[in-house]
C-alpha cells in the first residue's frame, strides 16, 4: 500500500493531483447535461430533471467513489495503479492455468487498447465543448469554432516535445480555480431552485426508470459522460498517492461536481431555453468570455493528462514485450516519468484532428464517447473480482456481491452505449481492435523469433568449454553481446568469432528482462554469473515503468568489473525477418504486420541509450 504522507506534503500532492488526475472527470459538466436533455430530446419536467440528477449523483457515488476511490485504489502494485498494474497483480499471484492466464492477459491488454481510443476522443470533445461557449455570446463566431479548436489541439501536441515541466506547476492552481468556480456557479443556480436537492435521494432515479423504461435505460449512454475519467484516479495513484487523491476527491472535487450538476438542473427548471448550453448559461452574462477562457485552459490540462497517460501506457506495453521498441525521449532532467514518444504523439494528433473535422461538434462526438470507457470499467471489475478472491483472500460471498454490484452498473452503462456504435461508437472500438491486434501480434512474433533463435543457437556451457579447449586469439577491451535467449550464445557473438577469429579479453552476454512489477529496486537490478574464460552472463532487470539505461546499469555492476565506456563495444543483432507464408505459427497478414513493425522499431542502441560510437550491428536473416 502507498506510504502515508505528512500534512504539508499531502497538501502539495493534492494540489498536484488537481492538475493531473481530475482533469477529465472535472470537465464533464461542460457537456453532460447538454447531451442528456438536448441529445435525447428529454422533456424538461421536474421529474425528469430530478431523475437525471439522481442518476448522475449515484453514478458518481457508486462507480467513482465506491468502486474506484475506496475499493480499487487498495490494489496498488508497488504503489502504482492502472489497468496494467492491476493485471500484473492478478497475473503475479493467482494460481491460474495457462488458458485462464491467457484470457486474463488478453482482457488486461484489451483494456489498455481501449484506453487509446479514449485518448483520441477526450481532447477532441473537451476542447470543442469549451470553445463552443463562444457561440452563446456571439453566434456569428460559429464558423471559427472548428479552426480555433484545431489550432489549440495542434499547439498542444506541438509543445509535447519540449515537455510541460515549465507550465505544469500552473495546472494545479488553474484546476483549483476551475473547481471553485464550478461550485460557486452551481450554488447560485441551486439557490434559485432548491427543490433539485431532492435528487440526492435514489428514489428519483428509480422512478425515472419506471416511468421511461427502455428510453430511460438508453439515457445512461449520456449519463456516463459524468463519470468518464474515473479510471484516471486509479491510474495516476503512483504519482500522488492514495491519501491525497481520496482527500481531494471527497473534500473538494466531488462536492464541486455535484453542486454544479445540480445548479445546471435548477437552471433548466427555471429557464428551459438554457438547454442549448446549460453550463455556460449558468454563468452571468459578463462572465461568459472569462468562463470560456478558463474552460479552455481546463480542457487543455485534461487533454495533457490523457496524452501523458498515453505515453506512459505505451512505455509499459513496450517494456512488457507487447509492442515494438519506440523512440522515448525524456523531457525532464529530474522527473523520470515525464517522457515524450514522437510516434504516439503525432498519431494521436492526426487522430484527434480527424475526429474534430469528422464529427464537427461536441454533441456529435458524444455519440462516440463512452463505449471504450464503459468497457474498461467492466474489465477493471473482472480483474478486481479475481484480485479480491485470490490475492485479498476474501470469501466467495463478499466477492460475488461486490462483483455483481459493480458489474451490473458497468454492463448497464456499456449496454446503453452499445446502441450508439453506428452513430460514432464504432470509432474507439476500431482503434482498440487495431491496437490490440498490434499488441498480440508483436508478442506472438517475438515468441516465434525467440524459438527460431534458440533452435539456431548454441548452449552457453558447451561454448565456454570450447573456448578452454580451443582458445581463440584475444584482444583488449570489453565486448557486450545483447541477447533475448538467457541460455544460448548470441548470434552476434558466434558471427563475430566465425568471421573475425578473435574474442575480446572480457565478454559480457547481456540479457534484459522485464518483470511484472512497476519498478525493480537498484539492489535487485543486476545478476552476474562468471562462466569462466573471461565470459560473464549479466541479467539486467527492469519493471514496466522503469527508466531503461544499459550503460548506467553496467556502470553500477557489483561484480568487480569497472566498465570504461571508451573501452567497451556493444554488439547488437538485427534480424531481417522473412514471412513464412503462414507456416510459422501466425496467419500470413500477421507475419507481414510483425515483419513491418520489426523493420520500423527503434534501434536497440536508441532504446537502451547506448552511445552510437560504441555499437557494432550484425545482421541475420530469419524466417518466421
From Swiss-Prot:
Record's GO cellular component terms: plasma membrane
Entry keyword annotation includes Oxidoreductase: no
Transmembrane annotation, as ranges: 13-33, 52-72, 102-122, 139-159, 170-190, 208-228, 249-269, 291-311, 339-359, 368-388, 399-419, 421-441
Highest taxon listed in the record's lineage: Bacteria
Xref: InterPro entries: K+_transporter, K_trans_C, K_trans_N, Kup
Membrane topology: Multi-pass membrane protein
Keyword Ion transport part of the UniProt annotation: yes
Catalytic activity: K(+)(in) + H(+)(in) = K(+)(out) + H(+)(out)
One MF annotation (Gene Ontology) recorded for this entry: potassium ion transmembrane transporter activity
One Pfam family from the record: K_trans
Keyword annotations from UniProtKB, A to Z: Cell inner membrane, Cell membrane, Ion transport, Membrane, Potassium, Potassium transport, Symport, Transmembrane, Transmembrane helix, Transport
Compartment(s) where it occurs, according to its Swiss-Prot or TrEMBL record: Cell inner membrane
Function summary: Transport of potassium into the cell. Likely operates as a K(+):H(+) symporter.
Family: Belongs to the HAK/KUP transporter (TC 2.A.72) family.
HAMAP family membership: Kup
The protein's name in its UniProt record: Probable potassium transport system protein Kup
Organism the protein comes from: Thiobacillus denitrificans (strain ATCC 25259 / T1)
Lineage of source species: Bacteria, Pseudomonadati, Pseudomonadota, Betaproteobacteria, Nitrosomonadales
Amino acid at each position: 500500500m502507498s506510504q502515508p504522507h505528512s500534512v504539508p506534503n499531502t497538501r502539495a500532492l493534492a494540489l498536484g493531483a488537481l492538475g493531473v488526475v481530475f482533469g477529465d472527470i472535472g470537465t464533464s459538466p461542460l457537456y453532460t447535461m447538454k447531451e442528456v436533455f438536448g441529445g435525447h430530446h428529454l422533456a424538461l419536467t421536474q421529474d425528469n430533471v430530478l431523475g437525471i440528477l439522481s442518476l448522475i449523483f449515484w453514478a458518481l457515488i457508486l462507480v467513482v467513489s465506491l468502486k474506484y476511490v475506496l475499493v480499487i485504489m487498495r490494489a496498488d502494485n508497488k504503489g502504482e495503479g492502472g489497468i496494467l498494474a492491476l493485471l500484473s497483480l492478478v497475473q503475479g499471484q493467482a494460481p491460474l492455468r495457462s488458458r485462464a492466464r491467457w484470457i486474463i492477459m488478453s482482457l488486461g491488454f484489451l483494456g489498455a487498447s481501449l484506453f487509446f481510443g479514449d485518448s483520441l476522443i477526450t481532447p477532441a470533445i473537451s476542447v470543442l465543448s469549451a470553445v463552443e461557449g463562444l457561440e452563446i455570446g456571439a453566434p456569428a463566431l460559429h464558423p471559427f469554432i472548428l479552426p480555433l479548436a484545431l489550432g489549440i489541439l495542434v499547439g498542444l501536441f506541438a509543445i509535447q516535445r519540449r515537455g510541460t515541466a515549465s507550465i505544469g506547476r500552473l495546472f494545479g492552481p488553474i484546476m483549483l480555480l476551475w473547481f471553485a468556480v464550478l461550485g460557486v456557479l452551481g450554488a447560485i443556480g441551486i439557490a434559485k431552485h432548491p427543490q433539485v436537492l431532492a435528487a440526492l435521494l435514489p428514489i428519483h432515479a428509480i422512478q425515472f426508470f419506471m416511468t421511461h423504461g427502455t428510453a430511460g435505460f438508453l439515457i445512461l449512454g449520456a449519463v456516463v459522460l459524468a463519470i468518464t475519467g474515473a479510471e484516471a484516479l486509479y491510474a495516476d495513484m503512483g504519482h500522488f498517492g492514495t491519501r491525497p487523491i481520496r482527500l481531494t476527491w471527497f473534500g473538494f472535487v466531488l462536492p464541486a461536481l455535484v453542486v454544479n450538476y445540480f445548479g445546471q438542473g435548477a437552471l433548466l427548471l427555471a429557464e428551459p431555453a438554457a438547454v442549448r448550453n446549460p453550463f455556460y448559461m449558468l454563468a452571468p452574462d459578463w462572465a461568459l468570455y472569462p468562463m470560456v477562457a478558463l474552460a479552455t485552459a481546463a480542457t487543455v490540462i485534461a487533454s495533457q493528462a490523457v496524452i501523458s497517460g498515453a505515453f506512459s501506457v505505451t512505455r509499459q506495453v513496450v517494456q512488457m514485450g507487447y509492442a515494438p521498441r519506440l523512440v522515448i525521449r525524456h523531457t525532464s532532467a529530474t522527473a523520470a516519468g515525464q517522457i515524450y514518444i514522437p510516434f504516439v504523439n503525432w498519431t494521436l494528433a492526426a487522430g484527434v484532428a480527424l475526429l474534430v473535422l469528422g464529427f464537427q461538434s461536441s454533441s456529435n462526438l458524444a455519440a462516440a464517447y463512452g463505449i471504450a470507457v464503459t468497457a474498461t470499467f467492466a474489465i477493471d471489475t473482472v480483474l478486481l473480482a479475481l484480485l479480491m478472491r485470490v490475492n485479498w483472500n476474501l470469501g466467495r460471498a463478499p466477492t460475488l456481491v461486490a462483483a455483481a454490484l459493480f458489474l451490473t452498473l458497468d454492463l448497464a452503462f456499456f449496454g446503453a452505449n452499445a446502441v450508439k456504435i453506428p452513430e460514432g461508437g464504432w470509432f474507439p472500438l476500431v482503434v482498440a481492435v487495431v491496437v490490440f491486434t498490434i499488441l498480440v501480434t508483436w508478442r506472438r512474433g517475438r515468441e516465434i523469433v525467440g524459438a527460431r533463435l534458440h533452435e539456431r543457437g548454441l548452449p552457453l556451457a558447451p561454448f565456454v568449454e570450447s573456448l578452454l579447449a580451443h582458445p581463440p586469439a584475444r584482444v583488449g577491451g570489453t565486448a557486450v553481446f545483447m541477447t533475448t535467449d538467457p541460455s544460448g550464445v548470441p548470434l552476434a557473438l558466434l558471427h563475430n568469432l566465425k568471421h573475425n577469429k578473435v574474442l575480446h579479453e572480457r565478454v559480457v552476454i547481456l540479457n534484459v528482462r522485464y518483470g511484472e512489477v512497476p519498478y525493480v529496486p537498484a539492489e535487485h537490478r543486476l545478476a552476474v554469473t562468471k562462466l569462466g574464460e573471461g565470459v560473464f552472463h549479466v541479467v539486467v532487470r527492469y519493471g514496466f515503468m522503469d527508466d531503461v539505461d544499459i550503460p548506467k546499469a553496467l556502470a553500477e555492476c557489483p561484480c568487480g568489473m569497472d566498465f570504461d565506456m571508451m573501452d567497451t563495444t556493444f554488439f547488437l543483432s538485427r534480424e531481417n525477418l522473412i514471412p513464412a507464408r503462414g507456416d510459422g505459427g501466425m496467419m500470413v497478414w500477421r507475419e507481414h504486420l510483425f515483419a513491418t513493425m520489426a523493420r520500423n522499431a527503434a534501434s536497440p542502441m536508441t532504446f537502451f541509450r547506448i552511445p552510437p560510437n560504441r555499437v557494432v550491428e550484425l545482421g541475420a536473416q530469419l524466417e518466421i
